Amino acid sequence: MRTLHTLLVPCLLLVFQTVCAEDENSCGQCHEVDPVQFAESPHGDIACLDCHVGADDRRHKRGLDPVECAGCHAEIAEEQIISVHGPKGRQRMSDLELPSCSGCHGEIHVMTLTTEPSSPVHASRQGETCGVCHGSGQPAPPGVHTIRPIEAYTASVHASAVADGQHGAACSDCHSTHSPLPASNPRSRVHHSNVTATCGACHTAITAQFEQSIHGLAAANGVGDSPVCTDCHGEHRILAVGADGSPVSATNIPIRVCGPCHSNVRLNEKYGLAMDQVPSYEDSFHGLAARGGVQRVANCASCHGVHFILPSSDPDSYIHPENLAATCGKCHAGAGSRFKIGPVHVLADTTPNIVAHWIRVIYI
């Protein structure tokens, strides 16, 4: 009897394993899945029944419960569910409007790794994938006010770099992969208080300068009016500095970047800033030349700096009295102490310095 038992148990195990294997193979009798493609996919070593729970009955019903990726990807699922794409993060969207795992990553049986260019979520294809919902002609979800972000991104230096196979920011680099949040959420990567750190992940040297500047320190201390990267460079349509249409091009800086804040009466009164900085520049020989389209003429950044802007009282400031000769000397070779003869931002009817007044009159 013991001998029979010893022989019977292995036989039963063999039969059970064979039946299971047949069940797995039998899926292909009804479901057209390329076994070669699936075997090469990231999920190639997973059995059908690992995902399709309840399909073990050979006569299983049609319309099985949807596959739950969270069974294996629990941490990612927790991030996604509270994101703007999750049911808790976007209460006003129906479940049908919410992006699914396969909606972004592709059909699971032929899915490829995110590092592969063929993956829908590879950096080079994120614009296309995200554009299914956020592209031109698509109605923006309730509460989303950004117009055509994908079209704007496609024209940017970031998209050009990605297209050339270089390292460039794609959608997920700024908005995160599985947990994008509204820009109004303090935990969002693109919230005003986090923009510097988000851009700093790639632009480390520039960020280190900005964080020490008057603008960076103010932003870090919660001053929402203080500009961060996107306020000057834009959000999705970030262009090269010298490109036509770039807000930070030489001719646009005074008008489109510095001017809107430093000519704003509310901001100047709130923070005790001088009211005449912008109009006095516009009426100067530098300002008139810039308005005339001259590229090689001093603008705000030429004198005050770009990212490392400091008060004139700071010894490291480009416009500190002891540094003016060097600052002006970048354009005016041989500039010496005479370049400190008077204030720069002066209006014709207010300047108390007769020498500066006549220099201004002669040049204009």
Region annotations inferred by a language model:
Residues M1-H5:
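Positively charged n-region of N-terminal signal peptides that target proteins for export
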Residues T6-V15:
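Bacterial N-terminal signal peptides
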Residues T18-I364:
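Short sequence/structural segments immediately N-terminal
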